[in-house]
Amino acid sequence: MFASTWQTRAVGVLIGCLLDVVFGDPKRGHPVALFGRAAAKLEQITYRDGRVAGAVHVGLLVGAVGLLGAALQRLPGRCWPVAATATATWAALGGTSLARTGRQISDLLERDDVEAARRLLPSLCGRDPAQLGGPGLTRAALESVAENTADAQVVPLLWAASSGVPAVLGYRAINTLDSMIGYRSPRYLRFGWAAARLDDWANYVGARATAVLVVICAPVVGGSPRGAVRAWRRDAARHPSPNAGVVEAAFAGALDVRLGGPTRYHHELQIRPTLGDGRSPKVADLRRAVVLSRVVQAGAAVLAVMLVYRRRP
């Protein structure tokens, strides 16, 4: 049906992206949730307070997922490679769920339902919402939408386009492990080191591609491409993450808001440098961030297909 591997991959990536747009994440039996439960079970066996144990834990899980992806990609059948690529891409994406949650938090904050917004925030990020009021919840949600524009939208598409099913599933495994154990808490400071470093590597190029797309797409929401570039160049390196800082700074500059500052997690309070030099974000800015995130995903889909065609024989 399809003439070559590159056509198969391009069609599969586009179908996977459309499945995410139309259906979002499945409510039950999501592959990422199943992987997370398996990882938690394995951690009961592999956990030791050291980097080597953490590297073994990550290697076993990411290796298993990569081998599964390679096997799925090589199953016989004329339509199977497209179906495998589409399914893997869909499973790795989370743009629709991200946008839905961002809009829901916006709605709750506009109704001054701070308690409900606090309950919903953990589905976006690992912040401790207990002490956050409306402004803090708005900033936390906007920063999470920005960071996850890369993690849950752009980067999976680029891995799927460049290297197929094993790569996109492996990437999602790495990113999930980072969200589970890549913390600087007493338990995970050493055990989670490998997951955090591997996630930094896996997102490095994609985060910068995301920032470029933010610059290009900023005018769609009345944003400033020049402001995005300025904040990216000036502020990104101040962020503790080499990748999240790039994307969050670009969003801050594009939307003319100021992000960063005191950031409380369950295990620690971080005093982060500010990103951007605009106003404190309002609920309307969170809504703009959600729209910008969706437009960036559409741009990433186009970029992914271009990448596949560029790599064809």
From Swiss-Prot:
It is a multi-pass membrane protein. GO terms for cellular component: plasma membrane. GO terms for molecular function: ABC-type vitamin B12 transporter activity; threonine-phosphate decarboxylase activity. Pathway: Cofactor biosynthesis; adenosylcobalamin biosynthesis. InterPro entries: Cobalamin_biosynth_CobD/CbiB. It is found in: Cell membrane. One of its GO terms (biological process) is cobalamin biosynthetic process. Pfam families: CobD_Cbib. The chain crosses the membrane at residues 52-72, 79-99, 154-174, 204-224, 289-309. Keywords: Cell membrane, Cobalamin biosynthesis, Membrane, Transmembrane, Transmembrane helix. Converts cobyric acid to cobinamide by the addition of aminopropanol on the F carboxylic group. Belongs to the CobD/CbiB family. This is Cobalamin biosynthesis protein CobD. It comes from Mycobacterium tuberculosis (strain CDC 1551 / Oshkosh).
